[in-house]
């Protein structure tokens, strides 16, 4: 599983434009084979900063998304006039577990939190 962590700082007066672009792209995400989920968060320490966290089955699905023409157009707009700054991190998920599904939890955690 791949996590894409996209931090963005929209330019002054461009908050709504950023949200419009993100909303227009969301239906396209669901068309990508290998897309799992996406959520958007607003920073508590810097209310101007937004984080988009998406999960993908593999790097091929991320590449398909990255190269989708609508997404390339959004990237161009973002870099051109919507963003003051951004940072993108792409990471491999080592483990994925929760309160009830403990399959991938480390053995020492399973002993304590059974």
Across the structure, where does each feature detected by a protein language model lie?
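Conserved short loop/helix modules at catalytic or binding sites
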Residues: 74
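Short secondary-structure boundary/capping segments
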Residues: 79-80
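Short S/T/G/P-rich N-terminal loop/turn motif that feeds into the first structured element of a domain
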Residues: 1-50, 59-67, 83-114
